[in-house]
Amino acid sequence: MWGGRFSAKPAELMQAINVSIGFDKRLWAQDLAGSRAHARMLISQGVIARDDGEEILKGLDAIEGEIVAGAFPFRDEYEDIHMNIEARLRELIGPTAGRLHTARSRNDQVAVDFRLWVREACDRSAAQLEALQKALVAQAEQYADALMPGFTHLQPAQPVTFGHHLMAYVEMFGRDASRFRDARVRMNECPLGAAALAGSPFPIDRHATAASLGFDRPTANSLDSVSARDFALEALSAASICATHLSRLAEEIVLWTTPMFGFVKLTDAFTTGSSIMPQKKNPDAAELVRAKVGRILGSLTTLTVVMKGLPLAYSKDMQEDKVPTFEAFDALELSLLAMAGMVSDLTPNTEKMAAAAGAGFSTATDLADWLVRELNMPFRDAHHVTGSAVKAAETLGVDLAELSLADLRAIEPRITSDIYTVLTPAASAASRISYGGTAPAQVRAQIARWKELLG
């Protein structure tokens, strides 16, 4: 490959630190796709003879067959996937194999391979997110009216519905999917043909190879073409944000399945037991999804630090771009699939959620709103009056709705018995009719919108 310049073999330690076939063999399909596109372009442009090009293409087909069949001899001595394929091609068709590397460097070769892989990973993630959204929408539709407490600071705040709560995650995951689609648009430029860094003196057609590989256009600067890894950083950023959202939902599932909450149940399919405590049914799938954000965010940090301070153009440091990216998307894909399964699997305890919906004086804001609406009281004054009512209820050990009219009038004489119509969790939730609110009609509107968007 590059032995003409050297008079001695590299040290074993050099070979050990340099070899990457153990992980970059995952790029075999992308490497073959790039090589086919390059070979066809070389034929079309008359850079290599058609007979030679056809022989190369047949050899690449044979290599694909070997890899698919598990018969391809991946070898450490050839360092990486590119040279493993080229060496095998030479074994199959002879010296003609060497013509494939005309007007190409491993620098632009790995750049196109990696872009293709990351592009496919973004497409898979967006599709898996849509599957998760559909699972959430299905549950939300079934429980659009089911009351539960809404929380701030993990303290009861205001009544909401279970459907409304789930639809919040549909929105988050919708933004995640759009981030992957947006990243795909920016990365969809083809670096093939940039060669080592300065471009090629051969009459190549970079637009043709870009089109044949599904790119929108070739990259516009050869130095940037082989230097850039921001497409992977952007994809990892999207993955990290998505994993954060998954972690939040996973945490809630963990909480909801505890006896203290008891809001939902998971079947045996997504839980495990204990080696010593026979009664245990642990939400391990949710806990593992919650933890995966560490691996995924760590991958973003790893690649950011690798790229920080690198001069143009290619440096071997960039070999370290693949493992964190592969690991991050492996973890994300498994997390998305597991979460979709859990969401479909869970069964809410609507009675327990409804009973908890009124806990912690969760209708206090409704009392304040009634004072504003019916007595024309400034909200800050209404807030103070309501706080006094909460204090009185707390002292008596009752809920707001259980305070007598006399108790309430002792705080604000103008209060009438009509106040009791707003102090139930159901009335509270039903009153939130603003766009995007928790009123069941609004929740159903959100569901209808997403069902149309998701198809």
Curated annotation (Swiss-Prot):
Pathway membership: Amino-acid biosynthesis; L-arginine biosynthesis; L-arginine from L-ornithine and carbamoyl phosphate: step 3/3
GO CC terms in record: cytosol
Signal peptide feature range: none
Source organism, top-level taxon: Bacteria
GO biological process terms held by the UniProt record: arginine biosynthetic process via ornithine; L-arginine biosynthetic process
Enzyme Commission code(s) on record: 4.3.2.1
Any one Gene Ontology molecular-function term assigned to this protein's record: argininosuccinate lyase activity
Keywords, alphabetical: Amino-acid biosynthesis, Arginine biosynthesis, Cytoplasm, Lyase
Main location: cytoplasm
Catalytic activity: 2-(N(omega)-L-arginino)succinate = fumarate + L-arginine
Positions of transmembrane segments: none
Membership in a protein family: Belongs to the lyase 1 family. Argininosuccinate lyase subfamily.
PANTHER family, sorted: ARGININOSUCCINATE LYASE (PTHR43814:SF1)
UniProt xrefs under NCBIfam families: argH
Protein name in the entry: Argininosuccinate lyase
